[in-house]
């Protein structure tokens, strides 16, 4: 098996689709992982309405989770492996999946418990990189002037 590949892309107004900023995932490209990455980005305070900025921070969240030096790439849609035989393309806007391409008509799923465990694990891998207070299941942005 080659991986669990996916591309996450976002449309920027005034820019042709082929130049849309995109993230390539070699692993963790299933819908539960992508939705968990997006949820964690929101919890971690990423400005999800600013497409280019939020894609950069989403890339950071994913890279912190994956670790190492492989398994993730960035570029424009035209240069991505969009029809990859795994999960295809997730088009996102404001931190939500709004469209799919090349998904082969199937979606990976996770139970609520599996999804919550994945979110917790992603947050654990990211908590030292973002100004967020973690108290059990509660997350709160830190006020930099508090401490």
Q: What are the language-model segments listed below?
A:
Residues 12, 28, 103:
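A broadly conserved detector of short glycine/acidic/proline-rich loop/turn motifs that flank catalytic sites
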Residues 5-10, 90:
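Short beta-strand scaffold segments in enzyme catalytic cores
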Residues 18-29:
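Catalytic Cys-His active-site segments of thiol-dependent hydrolases/isopeptidases
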